Each structure stands twice: as C-alpha cells, then as structure tokens.
C-alpha cells in the first residue's frame, strides 16, 4: 500500500506498476505524518480495505463503484460524518463513532442541499452569467475567466454542479457541438476546476472533502490532480476585515466588555483609543494635513499578479503542479504577505481581545498604526496574541486570501464596493450557508462532553448543573466559558465591526450575515444564488437588508418553499425556506423580481399555475 501511495504522490509516478503521477494532498507523506510510519498487520489492513470496497445488501456482497460515486453521495457522507463523534475505548486500543444526544446535524448548522434546488439556483444565478460570457469575442477565454465561489462550501456540491454546467458550455464552444462528447466535457471540467472555482469553510474536514470531491469529478486520464490550495481554503467567511474598514482605524466600539472582561479595563481602553484618535487629529491639523486621514492599507496587487502567473502555468504535468505549489507557498509565506495578514488580523483581534489586568496591551488605534507601518516596533507578546486570536477565531480576509479577485482601486478612483473598499469580485457566489444563531447552544455544546447536562429537563436545571462544574469539573467549566467568550466575541464583531450594517442586529442568525457577505463578494455584474430560511424576507431583523435589495433592485428572484415534502429531511416540516437570487449594481438585467410562494418541490417552479 505504501508503495502505491508513494508512487501516486511522486513527481514521476511508478512505471513498474503503471501508476501515473497524480500528486495532491491525498498521497503526500506530510498530509498524515502520524500515520506515515505507523505499523499495521496485513490482516487488519485487509479488513479495512474490504470494508471500504464491498457492501452486503440482502445477503448479497457487492463491490462499491467508486468510479461513479457523485457529489450527492459524498455530500451525504459528509453530512453523516458531521454527526459522529469519536470516542476512545477505555483501554485506548481503538475508538468508536457514535451520535451523541442532541448532536444530530446541529453542531454545524449544515444541511446537504437537494440537487434539484442546486440546479434551480444555477438556472437563475449562473446561467445568465454564462450567457454573457458566450457573447464575448473569445467565449472560451471568457468562460475560463469566470470566478465562482461558495463561502460555506462543505463537500463542494454547489461548486461541482456549477463546474459541470460550465464545462458543458466550454466544451460546446471548443467543439462546436451542442452535445459535446464525454471526453471533451471531462477535459473542460478539469480546466474549470483548476481555474474557476473558489470555496471556503471553517471545518477542516469539509475543506479536504471538497478538494477530494473536485479531484474525483475532474480526473482526466494521464493528468495529475489540479492544484487547489489557493482556491479551496480554511477559514470563517464571516470574520474578517476589508480595506475600507481598516482605513478607518480601530473604532471605539471594539472595546465593549465580553464574557470574562473587566469593565473598568474596557473603559480605559475605549478612552485611550478615543484620545489617540483626537491627538492624531490635532497633529494633522497643526501640520496642515486632513483630519481623519485614512490608514494606509497593504496593496495586494503584487499578490494578485503572482496568483495570475501561477494560474497561467501548465498543469498537465506533475512537475508543473509542484512548481505551482512551491510558488504559492513562497508567496503566502513571504514577509510582505505575512505583514498584510498580520495587520488585518490585528484589526479584527481588537474586537475580541482579553480586556483584563495583566493581559497583553490591547490593539488600540496607535498600536494598530504601528503594526500596520512597522510590526517590528510592537512588543512580541502583542504580535503573538494577535496570531493566537486569529487562529482561534479563524479570521478570513477575502482581499488577502484571493488577491486575484479583489483589488484596491487606483489612486483617485472610487472602489466598486464602497463599504468594503475594494473593486472586482466574484462573478457568481452560490451556497446553502449554515442556519444557526451566533451564540452557544448549551444543549448541543454539552452533548458530547457531559450528556447529563445536555439532557437536563429544563434550561434552568441545565444552568444549575453548569454552575456545579466549578467544583466538580473545573477543566470542563473553563472550556465552556472559553467557548462562551468566543461566541460572544464573534457576535460582538458582527454587530460592531461595521462589516454588517444591514444584518448585524437583533438575535443574529448566520444565514442573514452570510447573505449580506455573499452580496458584498460579487462584482458589479455578478450574481448571488443562496438557500436561506424565508425569514430573510419577513423577519424583523432582516427587514433593513430586504428593503435595501428591493430599493436597489438587486433582487432577481425569491422562490419560497414549505418543507412538508421533506426536501430537508433533517429539519422540521413546518420550516419555510427560499431560493434567493441577487444581482450586482451593474447587472445588465434589471427586470422586476420573480416570486413564487408555497412551493413544495423544485418542479413547482416550472408550473405555470
């Protein structure tokens, strides 16, 4: 097995066994270093391979057909894995996977999307963009230049569905046939996967499964797996900054007290931040400069050029894939790239900093300026704390992660997106983001850690049991309070960072801020296609957002569904959800929005009655 794995992961393959060089993280020896030198008896390995290769149904043993496994099946596996919690056996010789009470699909807020819903969103969000590309003088180049993103990509169902539709159009352009051959579509699919798709998820398992899913779909005989490290990324799509926000410095609202903070320390920091801003203003006035001068923001143009050069490289040979990997690691590991990320991380960290006596000095306006201009001038403990917080909260800064998509406007020019301060954006943003509140759900949190607390008959009883942990299990109590603080910090950021002026209010649900994020990620001529609860149009907390998309004629369509037919079997049948499509401010089509209500299945959308 090691010979096969090493052969597939090598640059040259293994000619003796007719194994091609596929590359990718699947066979890299450093992907699972703990297992690289582990020993296993042949009998145990055979048992594992047999379990993966065969299933028994009605007493009949059948081989698993991995060649024809689709995105839906892998998505179902992903959703099932989210429910399972590994529990090490008492003798530490193995582990079992079990579903803890209260953990069924709730720990992630994720639900696999029915393919019919995905296809419907592609009709309204992707097809119009593809149609515009087909009208270009060079439609092949135009299609390959499209950028499609899912900011909560999971196992990649939306990206794969989009890739297949784009690949067929690309193959049609290349061959001139309305129904291109499977080989031409497969070749086009590999090009689409390697050049057009972007995805982000905060679950490491999802990121890896998404890559594997894309690789399986786009495998082309004799060619290595596409390089995807710069496309499919790990991070929290909702927690990050943007050039326009950083240019304003640290707002006073950043220093509101969170769970465990000292209110007196918070007041001191808020006052210090305000005084630093006032002192700076007085100095600028004295020097004849403009008060409120924006902070300098790292220009990511150089990084964007590096990514574009990387994408232009041939990827049909394993040597080229390795060169891409080396170049990307060199760029992302460079001092300049690290400084840009550090400044963005520091801005976000100010909102969730530990504000107690004895903690490292907080990132106030002056500290942020010093980090932005010369990180070496800042005490090391502050830099270390910024990095710790950034890792804990999985900060993700879109303009730094994807510098080929977002860029700063030229001096004197206005950005396409004034709120974010950038130009550019994705052509299409798709997805079914999590539907969950940004705060700790005690029942779900304790489901895998202390089932007795999770199973308490009432919320009051549960809180009493939690308080008893102070004396009975201080370690678990500290873990809970730390996660409670993290959730409090995430909510505070969403409400007060300025990134969510429309949805950062009330009892915030992640689907609302995802909808606002997705809208800000598209270019002026881009489109959003998203699955969200129908409360996006009816809830009090989203009325400002919905009013804005109506007034600006951003809404293309809203198709409302009832779940009575179990489209989402894991949620209540009374839940209503919608397929929402929005267009950018420069969209060529500005027709009145299309509405459908009380649909039960995707086929109802085509019913004239």
Predicted regions and their residues:
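Long, amphipathic alpha-helical stalk/connector segments used for oligomerization, subunit docking
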Residues: 269-329
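Residue-level recognition of alpha-helical structural elements
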Residues: 299, 324, 329-332, 336, ...
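Glycine- and acidic
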Residues: 58-66, 97-113, 143-153, 191-200, ...
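Signature of N6-adenine DNA methyltransferases within the class I
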Residues: 1-32, 116, 160, 167, ...
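Flexible phosphate/Mg2+-sensing switch loops adjacent to catalytic phosphate-binding sites
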Residues: 133-144, 166-195, 218-231
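Preference for the N-terminal adenyl/adenosyl cofactor-binding alpha/beta module
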Residues: 1-167, 200-206, 235-238, 338-450, ...
């Amino acid at each position: 097995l090691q010979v096969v794995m090493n052969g597939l992961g090598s640059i040259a393959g293994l000619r003796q066994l007719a194994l091609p060089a596929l590359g990718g993280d699947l066979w890299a020896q450093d992907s699972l270093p703990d297992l690289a030198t582990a020993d296993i008896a042949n009998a145990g390995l055979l048992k594992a391979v047999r379990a993966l290769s065969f299933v028994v149904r009605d007493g009949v043993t059948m081989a698993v057909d991995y060649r024809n496994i689709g995105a839906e099946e892998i998505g179902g596996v992903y959703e099932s894995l989210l429910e399972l919690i590994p529990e090490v056996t008492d003798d530490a010789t193995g582990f079992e996977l079990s579903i803890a009470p209260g953990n069924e699909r709730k720990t992630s807020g994720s639900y696999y999307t029915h393919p019919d819903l995905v296809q419907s969103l592609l009709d309204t969000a992707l097809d119009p963009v593809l149609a515009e590309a087909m009208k270009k003088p060079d439609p092949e180049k135009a299609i390959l230049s499209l950028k499609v993103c899912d900011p909560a990509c999971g196992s990649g169902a939306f990206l794969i569905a989009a890739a297949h539709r784009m690949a067929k159009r690309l193959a049609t352009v290349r061959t001139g046939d309305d129904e291109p051959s499977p080989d031409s579509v497969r070749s086009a699919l590999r090009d689409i996967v390697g050049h057009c798709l972007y995805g982000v998820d905060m679950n490491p398992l999802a990121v890896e499964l998404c890559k594997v899913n894309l690789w399986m779909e786009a495998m082309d005989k004799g060619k290595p797996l596409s390089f995807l490290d710069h496309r499919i990324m790990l991070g929290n799509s909702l927690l990050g900054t943007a050039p326009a926000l950083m240019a304003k410095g640290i707002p006073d609202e950043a220093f509101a007290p969170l769970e465990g903070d000292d209110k007196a320390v918070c007041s001191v920091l808020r006052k210090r931040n305000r005084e630093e801003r006032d002192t700076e203003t007085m100095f600028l006035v004295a020097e004849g400069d403009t008060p409120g001068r924006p902070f300098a923001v790292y220009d990511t143009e150089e990084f964007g050029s590096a990514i574009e050069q990387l994408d232009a490289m041939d990827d049909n040979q394993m040597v080229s894939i390795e060169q891409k990997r080396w170049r990307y690691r060199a760029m992302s590991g460079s001092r300049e790239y690290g400084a840009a990320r550090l400044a963005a991380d520091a801005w976000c960290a100010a909102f969730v900093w530990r504000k107690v006596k004895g903690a490292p000095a907080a990132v106030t306006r002056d500290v942020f300026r010093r980090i932005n201009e010369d990180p070496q001038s800042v005490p090391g403990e502050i830099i270390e704390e910024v990095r710790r917080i950034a890792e804990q909260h999985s900060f993700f800064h879109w303009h730094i992660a994807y510098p080929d998509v977002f860029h700063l406007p030229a001096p004197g020019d206005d950005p396409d997106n004034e709120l974010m301060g950038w130009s550019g954006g994705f052509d299409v943003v798709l997805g079914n983001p999590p539907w969950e509140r940004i705060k700790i759900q005690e029942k779900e949190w304790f489901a895998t850690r202390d089932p007795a607390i999770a199973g308490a008959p009432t919320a009051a009883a549960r809180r009493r049991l939690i308080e008893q942990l102070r004396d009975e299990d201080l370690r678990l109590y500290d873990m809970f309070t730390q996660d409670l603080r993290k959730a409090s910090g995430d909510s505070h950021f969403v409400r007060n960072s300025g990134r969510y002026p429309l949805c950062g209010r009330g009892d915030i649900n992640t689907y609302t801020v995802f909808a606002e994020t997705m809208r800000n990620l598209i270019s002026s001529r881009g489109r959003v296609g998203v699955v969200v609860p129908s409360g996006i149009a009816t809830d009090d907390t989203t009325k400002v957002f919905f009013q804005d998309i109506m007034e600006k004629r951003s809404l293309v369509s809203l198709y409302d569904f009832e779940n009575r037919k179990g489209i989402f079997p894991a949620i209540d049948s009374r839940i209503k959800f919608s397929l929402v499509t929005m267009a950018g401010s420069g969209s060529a089509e500005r027709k009145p929005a299309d509405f459908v209500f009380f649909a039960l299945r995707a086929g109802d959308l085509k019913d004239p009655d």
